[in-house]
């Protein structure tokens, strides 16, 4: 079934194609910002109850340090790596053996664009670097530093994917912003 298809996709040479979905980064306007935080978050959707959505975002929106916060949702179905490719590289991908993809496939990715503009680019993911071959394609996409679950031993793990919980990485994000 679905699990077998997923396992097969993880071993399949990736095929990239034009994007047929909207992207959240289309609303990103970093002009004049010397630091940018982009969070690509796998989600089961926005709550139908607007009050619940407001409660979820309340702490973030109350932060005085943000110059611009935008949020929203759109319909998308696929694995998290497909969302990453959509947002970071403006591409759709079938087949997740991304270590097999040539570096030139990633030259237009957002981290590479920011890197070429002089930004320091750092990626963090609580899962293993082996998952979706992130150890291979994150550097190709332009991330100068990539930190994964292997670097966060001892931090709390979430059962949904057995990786380090996003909330346990907040201090690591702060350290990265302080260092760059």
Regions found by a protein language model. Name each.
Residues 2-178:
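Soluble catalytic regions of membrane-associated enzymes that act on cell-envelope
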